[in-house]
Swiss-Prot record:
Gene source species: Oryza sativa subsp. japonica (Rice)
Subcellular localization, as worded in the UniProt entry: Nucleus
Swiss-Prot/TrEMBL domain comment: The SBP-type zinc finger is required for the binding to DNA.
Protein name: Squamosa promoter-binding-like protein 2
Its job: Trans-acting factor that binds specifically to the consensus nucleotide sequence 5'-TNCGTACAA-3'. May be involved in panicle development.
Listed Gene3D superfamilies: Transcription factor, SBP-box domain
Residues binding Zn(2+) 1: C92, C97, C115, H118
Binding site for Zn(2+) 2: C134, C137, H141, C153
Region (Disordered): 1-81
Length: 412
């Protein structure tokens, strides 16, 4: 069948319906506006609704001025500070004390919360207990913990004394002076004592004329022998050296020079520096033996020196005999005894003045200690020493041999 290619004409008026006034195009547009709305109407409606809702919103208050806010903050701070000061007003801790410590001149009482009167009161009541204020630690303490004399607590006082007081040195004890020296009894050399005498000139070391009498100017011109260290075997060797020789060939051993106090000689041992002492021979053995003392050391030689073995005892018929000492051990501090068989004592040096003659004398010098002893002899003589031991000298007027007795001396 044949199709009609022409499109039928549509009548809009019949489809939509008649509209009063205007053409068909205008009527069709009005019908669409009622159902869908035009774009212009949408914009107008939105603008009108926004304008009507704006007055309904609540507007925020305007910001206050800066000056008013700072003044309010300062006022709040002042109020809080005033409350704190009222709560921290210092008051005395003692019960019943209404003292206002804010008026005290010293800040000490405000810091420790005690008035000046109660800080020195013997007994106060704090927290229901009897206490006392300690001025050392600035606290209240019970009466049992307090020292009434010192006005301080005992615990604080003990610590204060320990910090302030220096330790006192132990009293001088001769046993502790030579703690480094052990073993058998010995003599010890002290160069710090004798160095002064060794360096002194002959003019400075002259003894008074009434104390020392020099019989020969060249009595100390010969070479000196070394000193003996009296310790162990050295003591036995010393016993064999120090004896009285002569034509009679008699030997007097010194028991204080031997370790076992025996009479026999022992094997020889080296010679060392020793504590100074002097042995003076008798008048009988002048030509065979002599001993010397110089600068705090002992020197001895035995036999064969007849031309130099000068007597150290005076042959003067006066009632005193004196020992010649070339140099003193110390520059001063001497004590000199009177005449007539008295004693002569010097600091660090001891020797004898004896009545009569032809008497064996033993003199010794030693380091000064705190004690001094004097021993009378049969010839009304005295041996005064400053040291650790002494020797008793006894002799008969008719005999030239003198027995020498040794007393025990301290060993360290």
């Amino acid at each position: 069948m044949d199709w009609d290619a022409k499109m039928p004409s549509w009548d809009l008026g019949t489809v939509v319906g008649p509209s009063g006034g205007g053409g068909g195009g205008g009527g069709g547009g009005g019908a669409l506006d009622l159902k869908l709305g035009a774009p212009t109407s949408w914009k107008t409606t939105t603008t009108v609704s926004a304008a009507s809702a704006a007055p309904a919103a609540v507007a925020p208050p305007p910001p206050p001025p800066a000056s008013s806010s700072s003044s309010a903050a300062a006022a709040g701070k002042r109020a809080r500070a005033g409350q704190g000061q009222q709560a921290a007003v210092p008051a005395c801790s003692v019960e019943g004390c209404a003292a206002d410590l804010s008026k005290c001149v010293r800040d000490y009482h405000r810091r420790h919360k005690v008035c000046e009167a109660h800080s020195k009161t013997a007994v106060v009541t704090v927290a229901g207990q009897q206490q006392r204020f300690c001025q050392q630690c600035s606290r209240f303490h019970l009466l049992g913990e307090f020292d009434e004399e010192k006005r301080s607590c005992r615990k604080r006082l003990d610590g204060h004394n320990k910090r302030r007081r220096k330790p006192q040195p132990d009293p001088l004890n001769p046993g502790n002076l030579f703690a480094n020296h052990h073993g058998a009894a010995r003599f010890t050399s002290y160069p710090q004592i004798f160095s002064t005498a060794a360096s002194m000139s002959p003019q400075e070391t002259k003894w008074p004329a009434n104390v020392v009498k020099t019989e020969a100017a060249d009595v100390f011109q010969e070479p000196y022998y070394h000193a003996l260290h009296l310790n162990g075997a050295g003591a036995a060797a010393a016993a064999s050296i120090f004896h009285h020789g002569g034509n009679k060939a008699r030997k007097h051993h010194f028991p204080f020079l031997t370790a076992d106090h025996g009479g026999g000689a022992a094997a020889a041992s080296p010679l060392f520096g020793c504590q100074p002492f002097t042995i003076t021979p008798s008048s009988e053995s002048r030509s065979s033996s002599s001993s010397r003392h110089s600068n705090g050391k002992m020197f001895a030689h035995d036999g064969g020196l007849d031309n130099c073995a000068l007597s150290l005892l005076s042959d003067n018929p006066t009632p005193t005999a004196q020992i010649t000492i070339p140099q003193p051990l110390f520059a001063g501090g001497g004590q000199y005894g009177g005449g007539g068989g008295g004693d002569v004592s010097l600091t660090g040096l001891s020797y004898v003045r004896m009545a009569g003659k032809d008497t064996s004398i033993l003199a010794k010098s030693a380091t000064t200690t705190a004690t001094t002893a004097t021993t009378p002899t049969t010839t009304s003589a005295q041996l005064q020493y400053h040291g650790y031991y002494h020797h008793h000298v006894s002799a008969d007027q008719g005999s030239s041999d003198a027995a020498i007795q040794a007393l025990p001396f301290s060993s360290w």
